A protein has these predicted regions:
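Beta-propeller folds
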Residues: 1-507
Length: 507
């Protein structure tokens, strides 16, 4: 008797239940010229009654074997649950004419998505949401608890809302296989349009909600193609607008933060590419912003220096985050008035450059860099003063908001955020000098982080951050331009935000 047989015999004696044994059904399988016998190929057929019976037997055995631990299991569950604040809410985020936020309620399994109308066009101060009290004018956008009724499993797999706040495109998974079924709902009437997009990977609206772009999945769950749908027409008439033939790459689609482009992002572990199409011509052809290069990752977002041109005109910007010239990434800002597509990596003004030291391809940047310690101080004439001499410098993203700019980077293995006013950034950009960032250090990070802070203490720290931004604005000749209006940047996705693929979206 071998060890497995002895263990099974012991379990059968102790529990009175035989350990389920999967039957062997030999099947030859050949790959790359090699043939082997797979005795359990039959288990792949999820619809087979034999498979269902075997899984049920395994479940019965597990339940009986684990029965003595039922009390401990409940104790652990209750302990974990006691550390969770069940009745809670998220920080409101403004999108177009509404503040959106999420509520969770004690005793309910799922969250509820809510919103309230903004008070005015200049309302950038998020409302104070109380856990147990609805706000004036509060609307339920999506109650997952109601939607989940009658399903053994339910997951909300994405939500996009039209610019006028009337239409919602949402996806649900009721099988647990991460293939989502998307529908379009009228938020004013609750009625749903007849078209359905079943078993897909994700979807997005155009700003006017007249078009839907969605991603197809192959048999391996790889998102590989993008389809275009005209709202109000049969799904059978949908058009394929992009297909990724290379199985190493996945595909995503979304809307750019400036809402002027539909973005297709495609990438592998080491290579990415972004394709764009103007929302003014949704039936047009997607074009690569920068053609794909092997082992080069990049992302792009768009912003604008309003009124900063010589004659008071706006300066449209493309903000490119890439590792084509530096293994620890860099950020380039392109003046789109003076550059034309197809763009090239390395065009524009270099705003922040990471350290090549200790990196595999560091020698491409500086001879001998790859053999140097990763913590060697690094300086680059393009970098802001606060980055000069940084140890282990890595650039992680930039966000150009309505009134200020935030730079995210890593030094000495720790994350950092630096800020400056947008007006000062425009001056530095046009003058061709390093940008004058100042590091932003919240009070909670200066000493011990108290996780039991009261709401008043948190508000005090928040006010302190605004004060630092005010001081920064004053130092850069902007008076108090940041105070009161820059708060939007902490709660919404205006302008360019942290870089991520595939295809950044505003939702």
């Amino acid at each position: 008797m071998n060890v497995k047989e002895a263990t099974n015999a012991h379990d059968e004696h102790q529990n009175g239940l035989a350990v389920p044994e999967a039957k062997r059904v030999p099947k030859e399988r050949t790959f790359h010229g090699d043939t082997f016998i797979d005795n359990y190929e039959w288990l792949r057929d999820k619809e087979s009654q034999d498979v269902r019976d075997y899984v049920a037997a395994q479940n019965r055995y597990c339940e009986q074997r684990m029965a003595p631990l039922a009390s401990l299991r409940k104790t652990l569950f209750d302990e974990f649950k006691s550390h969770v604040q069940e009745t809670d809410m998220s920080v409101p985020t403004r999108m177009d004419g509404y503040w959106y936020f999420t509520r969770t309620t004690q005793g309910k399994q799922y969250a509820t998505q809510c919103r309230v109308p903004v008070r005015s066009a200049d309302d950038w101060d998020p409302p104070t949401v109380e856990a147990d009290a609805p706000l004036d004018g509060e609307q339920v956008v999506f109650d997952t608890n109601v939607e989940a009724e009658g399903h053994d499993f339910f997951r909300l797999g994405g939500m996009d809302i039209s610019k006028d706040g009337r239409w919602m495109l949402y996806g649900t998974d009721t099988r647990g296989d991460e293939r989502y079924d998307f529908r379009i709902r009228n938020l004013e009437t609750g009625e749903e349009l007849p078209e359905q997009f079943n078993g897909i990977g994700g979807a997005c609206f155009t700003p006017d909600a007249q078009w839907v772009f969605y991603v197809l999945l192959d048999d391996a769950w790889r998102p590989y193609a993008v389809m275009r749908h005209h709202v109000g027409t049969p799904v059978s008439d949908d058009v394929e607008v992009y297909r990724e033939a290379d199985e190493r790459f996945w595909v995503g689609v979304g809307l750019s933060f400036d809402e002027r482009s539909i973005v297709i992002g495609t990438g592998s572990k080491t290579t990415t590419e972004v394709l764009l199409l103007s929302t003014d011509t949704p039936e047009g052809e997607f074009r690569a912003f920068i053609p794909r290069e092997s082992d080069v990752e990049y992302d792009v977002s768009f912003s604008c220096f309003e009124g900063a041109g010589e004659n008071g005109e706006d300066i449209p910007l493309a903000v490119v985050y890439h590792n084509a010239l530096n293994p620890n990434f860099e950020i380039d800002v392109i003046d789109m008035r003076t550059h034309e597509p197809p763009y090239k990596l390395g065009e524009g003004v270099r705003v922040a450059v990471g350290s090549p030291y200790g990196c595999e391809h560091g020698d491409d940047v500086e001879p001998g860099a790859s053999s140097m310690p990763i913590g060697t101080p690094y300086s680059n004439p393009c970098n802001p003063a606060i980055l000069q001499g940084a140890h282990g410098l890595g650039i992680e993203g930039i966000a150009i908001h309505r009134h200020f700019v935030a730079l995210q980077y890593r030094a000495e293995s720790l994350p950092h955020i630096a800020v400056m006013t947008k007006a000062a950034a425009a001056e530095d950009f046009l003058a061709g000098r390093p940008w004058r960032f100042t590091e932003l250090v919240p009070h909670a990070l200066e000493g011990d982080w108290d996780v039991d802070e009261s709401v008043d203490e948190i508000n005090e720290e928040r006010a302190e951050i605004w004060g630092k931004l005010d001081a920064l604005a004053a130092a850069q000749g902007e008076g108090s331009a940041v105070h009161g209006i820059s708060r939007k940047a902490m709660t919404s996705s205006d302008g360019a935000t942290a870089d991520k693929m595939p295809g950044e979206t505003r939702r």
